[in-house]
């Protein structure tokens, strides 16, 4: 396997050579709340990364990946952030569904989908949350019934990121009549370009519309496009969520580090850094980011079997940190941040508005704390009613 520092130098050189010309204007684009920015141009950039073998770094070589270590992948994310490269467009495919198919998919599913994920020719979205099943995902009500050699799907998903730009969706649906909670769920791969699927973008407080409602009205997918066994969807879905931690989480933190660095520069430029309270909060933000990095590295380098509560602690750490950063940004800007939309501070106003949801989506803080309390600390269940 290639030496990590040699690989780092290779990535740095490739980015310097390729993030130029037509792609130079993409620097810094994309990211949370900004997925719409130059989407097709970023997709073309993502395809150039794939052609250079700089996607799917952790996938096994037999599945089209590089089979690289955690240290190599960390080095890639660090160099990618240092180059201010644009956010990639196929996170759900490369980081979530791909590893899930490698772990649970049939050989036919792997041959059908993994090359198209790797080459960024098919984009995916995640069909988990519903109007009545957000943080409490086990309350999923979307149904799928077998009709000959196809599943017939009915129901609604919500807060589905980038569904309007995706070709496929991995959907958690109830396939056993009368089942409740975690039982009777299946993990289906569903094409979105069909008459039975309607996608409605949701305009957010930021004015953008990355999230969507997705309606399934007798939508269909082939019977063999269930990942894992029918009825075992909860286990597969939870495995998918674990792939969001580790290197993927660390990559997210590197983006956060770039945001913090830009905010420090803004504080210097506006003289907000002269305020000792602002300086203290910037320092606390830096130490919090280092703590998250240490935690992410510890979980990646720890036991192969995931320890209970790791994902929940990670979610609490980054959600609170990023929301606090949005609040700090508004305090650095001061009054102009409240009265001058679409101006010099637009980027920071948008960050503040978007981060209000960080402690809600992906499992609210309250749900995360309940899980830690009940499943890790062994405390009594929360009283209901």
From Swiss-Prot:
EC main group: oxidoreductase
Protein species of origin: Mycobacterium tuberculosis (strain ATCC 25618 / H37Rv)
Cofactor: how and how many bound: Binds 2 FAD per heterotetramer.
GO biological process: cholesterol catabolic process
Active site: 244 (proton acceptor)
Cofactor: FAD
Record's protein name: Acyl-CoA dehydrogenase IpdE1
Stated role: Involved in cholesterol degradation. Catalyzes the dehydrogenation of 5OH-HIP-CoA to 5OH-HIPE-CoA. Can also use octanoyl-CoA and dihydroferuloyl-CoA, with lower efficiency. Cannot use 3-oxo-4-pregnene-20-carboxyl-CoA (3-OPC-CoA).
Pathway recorded for this protein: Steroid metabolism; cholesterol degradation
Family: Belongs to the acyl-CoA dehydrogenase family.
Gene of this entry: ipdE1
GO molecular function: flavin adenine dinucleotide binding; oxidoreductase activity, acting on the CH-CH group of donors
Catalysed conversion reaction: 3-[(3aS,4S,5R,7aS)-5-hydroxy-7a-methyl-1-oxo-octahydro-1H-inden-4-yl]propanoyl-CoA + A = (2E)-3-[(3aS,4S,5R,7aS)-5-hydroxy-7a-methyl-1-oxo-octahydro-1H-inden-4-yl]prop-2-enoyl-CoA + AH2
Top-level taxon of the source organism: Bacteria
Amino acids binding FAD: 126-129, 161, 364-366
Keywords carried by this UniProt record: Cholesterol metabolism, FAD, Flavoprotein, Lipid metabolism, Oxidoreductase, Steroid metabolism, Sterol metabolism
EC number: 1.3.99.-
InterPro entries the UniProt entry points to: Acyl-CoA_Oxase/DH_mid-dom (IPR006091), Acyl-CoA_Oxase/DH_mid-dom_sf (IPR046373), AcylCo_DH-like_C (IPR036250), AcylCo_DH/oxidase_C (IPR009075), AcylCoA_DH/ox_N (IPR013786), AcylCoA_DH/ox_N_sf (IPR037069), AcylCoA_DH/oxidase_NM_dom_sf (IPR009100), Mycobact_Acyl-CoA_DH (IPR052161)
Quaternary structure and partners: Heterotetramer composed of 2 IpdE1 subunits and 2 IpdE2 subunits.
């Amino acid at each position: 396997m290639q030496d990590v520092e040699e690989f780092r130098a290779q990535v740095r050189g490739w980015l310097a050579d390729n993030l130029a010309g037509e792609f130079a204007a993409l620097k810094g684009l994309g990211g949370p709340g900004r997925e719409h920015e130059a989407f097709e141009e970023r997709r073309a950039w993502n395809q150039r990364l794939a052609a250079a073998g700089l996607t799917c770094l952790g996938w096994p070589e037999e599945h089209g990946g590089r089979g690289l270590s955690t240290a190599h992948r960390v080095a890639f994310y660090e160099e990618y952030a240092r180059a201010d490269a644009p956010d990639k467009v196929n996170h759900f495919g490369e980081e979530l569904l791909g590893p899930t198919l490698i772990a649970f998919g049939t050989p036919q599913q792997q041959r059908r989908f993994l090359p198209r994920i790797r080459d960024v020719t098919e984009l995916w979205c995640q069909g988990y949350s519903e109007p009545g099943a957000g943080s409490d995902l086990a309350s999923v009500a979307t149904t799928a019934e077998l009709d000959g050699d196809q599943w017939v799907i009915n129901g609604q998903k919500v807060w589905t990121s980038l569904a309007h730009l995706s070709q496929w969706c991995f959907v958690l649906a109830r396939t056993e009549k009368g089942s409740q909670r975690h039982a009777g769920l299946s993990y289906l791969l569903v094409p979105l370009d069909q008459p039975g699927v309607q996608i409605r973008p949701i305009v957010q407080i930021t004015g953008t519309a990355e999230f969507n409602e997705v309606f399934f009205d007798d939508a269909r997918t082939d019977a063999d496009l269930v990942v894992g066994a029918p009825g075992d969807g909860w286990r597969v879905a939870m495995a998918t969520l674990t792939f969001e931690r580790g290197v993927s989480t660390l990559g997210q933190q590197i983006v956060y580090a770039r945001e913090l660095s830009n905010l420090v520069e803004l504080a210097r430029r506006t003289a907000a850094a002269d305020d000792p309270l602002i300086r203290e909060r910037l320092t606390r933000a830096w130490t919090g980011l280092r703590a998250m990095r240490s935690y992410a590295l510890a979980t990646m380098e720890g036991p192969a079997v995931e320890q209970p509560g790791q994902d929940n602690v990670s979610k609490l750490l980054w959600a609170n940190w990023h929301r606090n950063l949005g609040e700090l940004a508004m305090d650095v800007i001061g009054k102009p941040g409240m009265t001058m939309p679409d101006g010099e501070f637009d980027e920071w106003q948008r960050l503040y508005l978007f981060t209000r949801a960080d402690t809600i989506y992906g499992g609210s803080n309250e749900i995360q704390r309940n899980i830690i309390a009940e499943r890790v600390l062994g405390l009594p269940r929360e009283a209901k009613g």
